[in-house]
Amino acid sequence: RGNSIYTIVDGPSWTEAEANSNKLGGNLVTINDKEEYSWGSDNVWSSQNYVANGFNEETMSYLGFNDKDIEGNYQWSSGEETEWNNLTDLIVAQNWFSQKQHFDGWDYGMIFANRDFEIEGTDARYTPYQNRGNIVLMDDNGSFYRNSGSNIVGIAETKFIRRGDSAYVIVEGPTWEEAEANANKLGGHLVTINDAE
């Protein structure tokens, strides 16, 4: 989408999923606006995408959303500014309305498969509410969900430069083999220079 490649990365914890995203030259996904939120629910954190990539359809994903540095100061791990007026509006209704007492230990954002931004709230326990996201706050390991048997991965978003029909990304790799493996995870290879241009 645009100049980003979205890739599922290993996510034993939010911190490790972010590190795995960094190896691919990116960060855990940043949701910039309602349009990207809807697109992501249909294409990135969708059951169909998970199944196509060998995961079960109820897989959850870590996002770049967090307040790990300063409690209550939500940001994206990419450091990007987004079109949201208030990032707390992205927190799922149950967390926001009933579980704020846990927020000191819940610093990392996750999302269930297929979840989109809600223009009109759908959780009957908290309706009426409007314009709320579905980002679940949890500890670094997603302990509650992981201990309940949920599969959790990360969604990496890597910016690229397009030239012709190629996309160029800087990936991490202390060795050629590791750099090539990271390029493969994005569906490509290390660069081939075809001519002087």
Q: Over which residues does each language-model region extend?
A:
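Extracellular, disulfide-bonded carbohydrate-recognition/adhesion ectodomains
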Residues: R1-E197
